[in-house]
């Protein structure tokens, strides 16, 4: 039988047909598709493969039980083993601690440190991110303190010439670029991982810096606040920020070791508690401003 296709009687009929098809496909321009959801925290009772990216803090330097880099360390008192132990109730937790003492988050900051005559141990982008296992379901990233110290030293030695603030702002932008590279690389290696980014506190407010000159602390503060904001920009589906910058308890001198730079057991326990809350479903976001951002005068 020959099928005869009859022409539509009017343009109105054609428009009605197009509208019907569009609505049937859910393509109405007034109803945009929801943004894709990223990986969620590991479900309660589900096994966890936890990978930590960090510097000496990841190894628990300053605590009573310091972990040897890359070695199993179930009894450590740093935030990585403390968090892992707290998550093990009723499930298996596998830990890959990639923390390297002295490491920089940013390759650019590491290069600046070398230019100041220091030997370095690496950076997160080149020495840690490439080793994130594909089966990882939870990642924490905490770094930036070493970057602040190195760039502060360079600025004090005249790296910025007559435009110190311009120099610092350029380093903040470079840090942000490297942070984005890091997170993109982690996501590329572990597509199903829930990522917690811990922003840097105001290093000028930590005990080790309280005896420094006002100009030095102003540089440290400018970098710290800038670095924290770059970390905050990494928030995305499946990536949340733990706001250490605006956490008043994080600056309590009783939570630091004798060097005033590394946390002690109490400081690491506080960080692990905050991380555990996020893993267990607590919401977390960074503040746009807080008193901890202005402990000294701005540049």
Predicted segments, located by residue:
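Catalytic His-Asp segment of secreted/periplasmic serine-dependent ester chemistry enzymes
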Residues: 200-299
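C-terminal motif of bacterial Sec signal peptides marking the signal peptidase cleavage site
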Residues: 19-22
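Serine-esterase "nucleophile elbow" of acetyl-processing enzymes
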Residues: 31-101, 139
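Oxyanion-hole/transition-state-stabilizing segment in secreted/luminal serine hydrolases
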Residues: 61-63, 107-173
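Short amphipathic alpha-helices and their capping/turn segments at secondary-structure boundaries
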Residues: 37-49, 82, 115-137, 181-192
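Solvent-exposed loop/turn segments at secondary-structure junctions
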Residues: 56-60, 100-106, 144-150, 201-206, ...
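Bacterial signal peptide processing site
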Residues: 24-27
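Bacterial N-terminal signal peptides that target proteins for export
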Residues: 2-12
């Amino acid at each position: 039988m020959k099928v005869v296709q009859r022409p539509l009687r009017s343009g109105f009929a054609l428009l009605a047909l197009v509208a019907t098809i569009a609505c049937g496909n859910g393509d109405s321009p007034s109803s945009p598709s929801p943004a894709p959801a990223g990986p969620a925290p590991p479900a309660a009772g589900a096994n966890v493969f936890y990978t930590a990216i960090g510097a000496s803090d990841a190894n628990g330097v300053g605590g009573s039980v310091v972990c040897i880099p890359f070695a199993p360390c179930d009894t450590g008192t740093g935030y990585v083993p403390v968090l892992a132990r707290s998550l093990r109730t009723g499930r298996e937790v596998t830990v890959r601690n990639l923390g390297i003492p002295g490491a920089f988050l940013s390759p650019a900051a590491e290069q600046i440190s070398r230019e100041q005559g220091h030997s370095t141990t690496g950076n997160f982008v080149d020495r840690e991110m490439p080793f994130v296992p594909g089966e990882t379901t939870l990642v924490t990233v905490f770094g930036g303190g070493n970057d602040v110290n190195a760039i502060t030293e360079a600025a004090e030695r005249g790296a910025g010439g007559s435009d110190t603030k311009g120099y610092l702002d350029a380093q903040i932008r470079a840090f942000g670029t490297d942070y984005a590279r890091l997170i993109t690389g982690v996501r590329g290696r572990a597509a199903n991982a829930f990522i917690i980014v811990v922003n840097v506190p105001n290093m000028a407010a930590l005990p080790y810096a309280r005896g420094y000159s006002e100009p030095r602390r102003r540089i440290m503060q400018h970098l710290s606040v800038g670095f924290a904001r770059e970390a905050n920009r990494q928030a995305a589906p499946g990536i949340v920020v733990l706001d250490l910058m605006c956490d008043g308890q994080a600056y309590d001198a009783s939570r630091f070791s004798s060097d005033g730079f590394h946390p002690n057991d109490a400081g690491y326990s506080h960080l692990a508690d905050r991380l555990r809350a996020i893993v267990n479903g607590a919401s977390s976001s960074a503040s746009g401003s807080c008193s901890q951002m202005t402990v000294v005068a701005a540049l």
